[in-house]
Amino acid sequence: MSSGGLLLLLGLLTLWAELTPVSSRKRHPDCDKPPDTRICQTVVRAFYYKPSEKRCVQFRYGGCKGNGNHFKSDHLCRCECLEYR
């Protein structure tokens, strides 16, 4: 095999190794819980993962710390709860 072929093979194996962990990641179990909408402190805008729609949705979070399915931003929600297949 030529040195160019070996470099190509090495590059493909490296790419595969880098992408494999991301593609098999599962979401956190808290992402399947309903949002806690009780009011305990100041109400702030937050996001929760809605499994039936497979997306993050904005809601009013009252600071009760009911479960882990509340995030300060849509980006954080998506990073934690979206599955990568």
From Swiss-Prot:
Query: Which Cys residues form disulphide pairs?
Result: C31-C81, C40-C64, C56-C77
Q: Which InterPro entries match?
A: Kunitz_BPTI, Kunitz_BPTI_sf, Prtase_inh_Kunz-CS, TFPI/VKTCI-like
Give the UniProt entry's GO cellular component terms. extracellular space
Q: Does Zinc-finger show up as a keyword for this record? A: no
Q: Which residues form the signal peptide?
A: 1-24
Q: Where in the cell does this protein reside? A: Secreted
Q: Name the Gene Ontology molecular function terms of this record.
A: serine-type endopeptidase inhibitor activity; toxin activity
SUPFAM superfamilies, sorted = BPTI-like
Annotated BPTI/Kunitz inhibitor domain ranges read: 31-81
Keyword annotations from UniProtKB, A to Z:
Disulfide bond, Neurotoxin, Presynaptic neurotoxin, Secreted, Signal, Toxin
Is the keyword Signal in the record? yes
Query: Tissue specificity, please?
Result: Expressed by the venom gland.
Instruction: Tell me which family the UniProt entry assigns to this protein.
Output: Belongs to the venom Kunitz-type family.
- Outline the subunit composition: Heterodimer; disulfide-linked. The A chain has phospholipase A2 activity and the B chain shows homology with the basic protease inhibitors.
Summary of the function given for this chain in its UniProt record: Beta-bungarotoxin is a presynaptic neurotoxin of the venom. The B chain is homologous to venom basic protease inhibitors but has no protease inhibitor activity and is non-toxic.
Full protein name: Kunitz-type serine protease inhibitor homolog beta-bungarotoxin B3 chain
In which organism is this protein found? Bungarus candidus
